[in-house]
UniProtKB/Swiss-Prot annotation:
HAMAP family listed in its UniProt record: 16SrRNA_methyltr_G
Function: Specifically methylates the N7 position of a guanine in 16S rRNA.
Chief location bin: cytoplasm
Record's keyword annotation contains rRNA-binding: no
Cellular localisation: Cytoplasm
Taxonomy, superkingdom: Bacteria
InterPro entries recorded: rRNA_ssu_MeTfrase_G, SAM-dependent_MTases_sf
GO CC terms: cytosol
Family: Belongs to the methyltransferase superfamily. RNA methyltransferase RsmG family.
Entry EC number(s): 2.1.1.-
Protein name per Swiss-Prot or TrEMBL: Ribosomal RNA small subunit methyltransferase G
PANTHER family (alphabetical): S-ADENOSYL-L-METHIONINE-DEPENDENT METHYLTRANSFERASES SUPERFAMILY PROTEIN (PTHR31760:SF0)
Organism: Streptococcus equi subsp. zooepidemicus (strain MGCS10565)
Keyword Cell cycle: no
Amino acid sequence: MTPQAFYLALEQAGFALTNHQKEQFDTYFKLLVDWNRKINLTAITEENEVYLKHFYDSVAPLLQGYIPNEPLRLLDIGAGAGFPSIPMKIMFPKLDVTIIDSLNKRIHFLQLLAKELGLEGVHFYHGRAEDFGQDKQFRGQFDLVTARAVARMQILSELTIPFLKIKGKLIALKAQAADQELEEAKKALQLLFAKVLDHQPYQLPNGDGRYITLVEKKKETPNKYPRKAGIPNKKPL
């Protein structure tokens, strides 16, 4: 997917980018490739692949209408090189974006990226979701939580739901095993007082299959969740 094809696809979906936004995506791509030589950010570095599998895939929830262009607080867990939240922020500048990532080198890259792109209302924290999820500054504070290729739904739900306000929503971007993951996560979602609102398949422009899973928080998360770092992964709910 060339940059031009990416812009055209967004325009056809009703999201015409400004020249400034196009320049931001171009700068993002160049910085990603440059920094990937220093630290391992992604295995995907060819321009057409980045625009398809990183940029387009990241903004799919916007194209599908899951996120409005409003000043909502969005938390991205394990964003790595900034996906999906930074492409979302470029498209919807009103979003207030927080990223938590366990690798400090990636946080350093994201800080530099935000500065180079001129992004405001972006915040970066180094650490584990399990620890931040028990911190009052973060727990129950977000309208939206996004996660892309972080963990299976059974684990991911415990790492993300505690951050949401009541009626806040988790938007999980998943590959083809999503149906099986949801079945495995039923108990975890019940324990966390969360409910699946939507679970939709979609295709990237090249035909690759993906899923968007939308989960709503119904009540306050029990205090014992998330459990200590590492436990959700070793002993899923």
